[in-house]
C-alpha cells in the first residue's frame, strides 16, 4: 500500500488529528474520531468499516488494511508530538463516527447514568461486548469516542455501538416496550440482585459520585443491590457494572 509522507507539524492532517484527540465538540462537529495504538488499529481494521486514515511512524509495520484507507508516514519526532501516549506505539488513526441508531430499548439492556470517567466507561463497554449485553449511554456520560475511553475498550468500541438517549427517552422506551426498569442502589429497600431475573429488564448503573439520578429512581420499577461486606461503602462503577452484566447473562 502506497504511503504519503508528512514532515511538518503544521500539516493540516496532523492539526486535524490533534484536535480530534483533544475535543469532543470537534469530533462531533467533524463526524470523526481518532484512536492511538497498533493493537487498536488491528481491531478497527478487522471490525470497523469507518476506518479512514492511518498515520504511521517511519519504520513501523502495519497490519493489513482495507484498500480505501489512506496511509500517511511521519517521523518519530512528529509521532511523539501528536500522540497522547507516554510511549507511542507508532500508529494513530481516524475513523468516521457511527451513524446514530434509532432510540429503542430491548430486554437485557444496561443503562449508564452519568458515568463520567472515560476509563470506567471503556471498561464497562469492553465487558458488555464480551457478554453480549447492549449498552445505552444516558445524560452526563463520558464520550464513548474519547481516546481514553477507546483505549479502555480494547477494541470493543469497534464491534458494538453504544446508543445514546436522554433519561426521559429511556423511561419512555421502557414503558412502550413493557420492560421493567431497575436501578442499582445502596438502600435498605433494594433487593439482592441474585433474587431478580435481570435478563428481561433494563438495569441502571449510576455515576461514581452520585449514583443513579433522582429522575430515574422515581421512574424505576424497583431497586437492586449488590450484596457485599458492610465495611465497604461502595464499588467502583466499572466493578459494579461487571457484576450486574454477569448476572444479566445468568
What is each residue range found by the language model?
Residues 3, 32, 71-73, 162, ...:
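Conserved beta-strand scaffold positions in the cores of enzyme catalytic domains, especially
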Amino acid at each position: 500500500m502506497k504511503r504519503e509522507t508528512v514532515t511538518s507539524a503544521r500539516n493540516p492532517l496532523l492539526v486535524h488529528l490533534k484536535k480530534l484527540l483533544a475535543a469532543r465538540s470537534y469530533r462531533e462537529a467533524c463526524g470523526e474520531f481518532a484512536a492511538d495504538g497498533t493493537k487498536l488499529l488491528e481491531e478497527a481494521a478487522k471490525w470497523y468499516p469507518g476506518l479512514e486514515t492511518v498515520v504511521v511512524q517511519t519504520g513501523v509495520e502495519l497490519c493489513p488494511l482495507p484498500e480505501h484507507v489512506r496511509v500517511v508516514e511521519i517521523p518519530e519526532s512528529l509521532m511523539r508530538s501528536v500522540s497522547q501516549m507516554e510511549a507511542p506505539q507508532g500508529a494513530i488513526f481516524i475513523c468516521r463516527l457511527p451513524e446514530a441508531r434509532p432510540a429503542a430499548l430491548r430486554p437485557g439492556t444496561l443503562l449508564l447514568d452519568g458515568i463520567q470517567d472515560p476509563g470506567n466507561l471503556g471498561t464497562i463497554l469492553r465487558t458488555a461486548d464480551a457478554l453480549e449485553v447492549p449498552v445505552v449511554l444516558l445524560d452526563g456520560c463520558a464520550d464513548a469516542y474519547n481516546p481514553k475511553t477507546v483505549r479502555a475498550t480494547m477494541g470493543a468500541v469497534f464491534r458494538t455501538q453504544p446508543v445514546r438517549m436522554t433519561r426521559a427517552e429511556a423511561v419512555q422506551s421502557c414503558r412502550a416496550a413493557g420492560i421493567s426498569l431497575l436501578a442499582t442502589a445502596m438502600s435498605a429497600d433494594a433487593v439482592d440482585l441474585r433474587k431478580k431475573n435481570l435478563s428481561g429488564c433494563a438495569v441502571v448503573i449510576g455515576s461514581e459520585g452520585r449514583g443513579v439520578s433522582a429522575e430515574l429512581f422515581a421512574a424505576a420499577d424497583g431497586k437492586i443491590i449488590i450484596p457485599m461486606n458492610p465495611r465497604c461503602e461502595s464499588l467502583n462503577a466499572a466493578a459494579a457494572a461487571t457484576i450486574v452484566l454477569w448476572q444479566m447473562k445468568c
